[in-house]
């Protein structure tokens, strides 16, 4: 049932993306060709020699942490020394960034908003952010899901950090992956160094929350972030023009939203 749900999720995301990119006055076949070409280029980028080499390095580093005492030592330090009511509150506020049921409709809405208001700077920027986020998820989710089970890692509350291939499905943090995507795609469109650095830091918050809540080891959160970074790099390889206006995800009361930022 879980595999079926995942498949339906990816198929639905592809269909939604196709509708999002459809332009007024063009036939559906043209829109499908456009999205097929765009996504195929994203996949070509992700499975290129350079990206796969970077992915392998990330997997190797995560494995080094998981299969030694380092992961559990980090977890113990966070739980015994760093975690408190304040970190729990922050963690609770950033956790929704990793909830696909909340964020994917937000990205789709941003993409649709961009299509209807593409002649305005705000509309085009919002649309690009939404589409890039959807594309990053579409290209990064399959390898992330595979690595979750292939590594066989378990949660801190369940077992040790060591990898036991196909024994469990928590070797990569899905929340860390999903929570990093909107910040990373926004960072790709920012030229201001301070804004870019702030967004990169923001992309790590959801992964950190999983460590704080004792739901994932450091290596699992880090690997989820790394897959998101590589996927966002491929989804954001276009649209490199300078931007003073960017759209970033924002946590609001009882939900998620987006915030437009104009910097000078």
Show which residues each predicted segment covers.
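Perimembrane loop-to-helix junctions flanking transmembrane segments
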Residues: 78-91
């Amino acid at each position: 049932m879980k595999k079926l749900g995942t498949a339906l999720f990816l198929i639905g995301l592809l269909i939604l993306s196709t509708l999002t990119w459809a332009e007024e006055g063009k036939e559906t076949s043209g829109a499908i060709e456009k999205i097929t070409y765009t996504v195929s280029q994203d996949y070509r980028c992700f499975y290129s020699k350079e990206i796969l080499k970077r992915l392998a390095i990330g997997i190797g580093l995560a494995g080094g942490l998981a299969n030694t005492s380092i992961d559990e030592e980090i977890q113990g330090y966070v739980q015994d020394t760093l975690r408190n009511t304040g970190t729990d509150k922050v963690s609770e506020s950033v956790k929704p960034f990793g909830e696909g049921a909340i964020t994917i409709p937000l990205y789709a809405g941003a993409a649709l908003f961009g299509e209807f208001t593409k002649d305005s700077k705000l509309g085009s920027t919002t649309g690009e952010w939404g589409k890039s986020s959807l594309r990053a998820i579409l290209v990064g989710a399959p390898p992330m899901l595979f690595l979750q089970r292939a590594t066989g890692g378990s949660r801190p509350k369940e077992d040790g950090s060591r990898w036991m291939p196909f024994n469990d499905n928590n070797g990569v943090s899905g929340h860390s992956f999903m929570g990093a995507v909107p910040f990373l795609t926004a960072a790709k469109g920012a030229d201001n160094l301070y804004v870019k650095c702030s967004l990169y830091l923001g992309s790590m918050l959801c992964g950190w929350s999983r460590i704080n809540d004792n739901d994932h080891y450091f290596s699992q959160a880090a690997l989820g972030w790394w897959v998101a970074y590589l996927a966002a790099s491929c989804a954001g390889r276009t649209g490199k023009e300078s931007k003073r206006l960017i759209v970033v995800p924002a946590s609001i009361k009882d939900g998620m939203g987006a915030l437009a930022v104009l910097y000078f």
